[in-house]
Amino acid sequence: MDESLADLRQELLALLCRDAYRAGDFTLSSGQKSQYYINCKPVTLSARGAYLVGRLFLEQLAPEAVAVAGLTLGADPLVVAVSVLSNLAGQDRAALIVRKEAKGHGTMSFIEGPPLPQGAVVTVLEDVITTGGSALKAVGRLQEAGYVVNEVLGIVDRQGGGAAAFAAQGIPLRSLFQISDLEAYLNRT
């Protein structure tokens, strides 16, 4: 397919505004109150949305990252999309899913996915970042397992302190969109 990244980004923005953004009174996972909510799952669990996110994230991955990971459930479709598209592009980056709690049976592990060597570089993916709490939990679990987290990539940064929380850990945050991008698009339509 001969699609420009700018066109893919615009298409994803339109999908997010149509299918993920909701106005109203909400309590976020951080406990904060908000006048809007962004649920990316209707987008990232659709075939086209998964493709768009996967392509755009794959283009941003550092060459040294051998895997992508994220906290279940929001990051599950993200890591799978990037991993599958990486294989099609000849890059073969593994997908890791980080559990919120250790599995209560079998291996009792926090991380599901193919085994990687100690020191393997992993990029954490997140759908929506507010304070960064969910992604930081994934970062901690990955570091405890002996992996090196090089950065966090998000779909939407709500600009609620997440970037500062990652910076305090020495981990860069990059996002496909800021909340201001969604607001500007919604104001135009």
Swiss-Prot record:
Source domain of life is: Bacteria
Any coiled-coil ranges, and where? none
Q: Which UniProt keywords apply?
A: Glycosyltransferase, Magnesium, Pyrimidine biosynthesis, Transferase
The GO terms describing molecular function are: magnesium ion binding; orotate phosphoribosyltransferase activity
Tell me, what is an example of a GO biological process annotation in this record?
A: 'de novo' UMP biosynthetic process
Cofactor(s) listed: Mg(2+)
Q: Which residues bind orotate?
A: T130, R158
**Keyword Glycosyltransferase appears in the UniProt entry:** yes
InterPro entries documented for this protein: OPRT (IPR023031), Or_phspho_trans_dom (IPR004467), PRibTrfase_dom (IPR000836), PRTase-like (IPR029057)
Return the Gene3D superfamilies for the record.
3.40.50.2020
Task: Report the CDD domains cross-referenced here.
Answer: PRTases_typeI
Enzyme class at the top of the EC tree: transferase
Q: In which pathway does it act?
A: Pyrimidine metabolism; UMP biosynthesis via de novo pathway; UMP from orotate: step 1/2
Binding site residues for 5-phospho-alpha-D-ribose 1-diphosphate: R99, K100, K103, H105, E126, D127, V128, I129, T130, T131, G132, G133, S134
How is the quaternary structure described? Homodimer.
* Function statement: Catalyzes the transfer of a ribosyl phosphate group from 5-phosphoribose 1-diphosphate to orotate, leading to the formation of orotidine monophosphate (OMP).
Q: Which family does it belong to?
A: Belongs to the purine/pyrimidine phosphoribosyltransferase family. PyrE subfamily.
NCBIfam families associated with the record: pyrE
| The protein's name | Orotate phosphoribosyltransferase
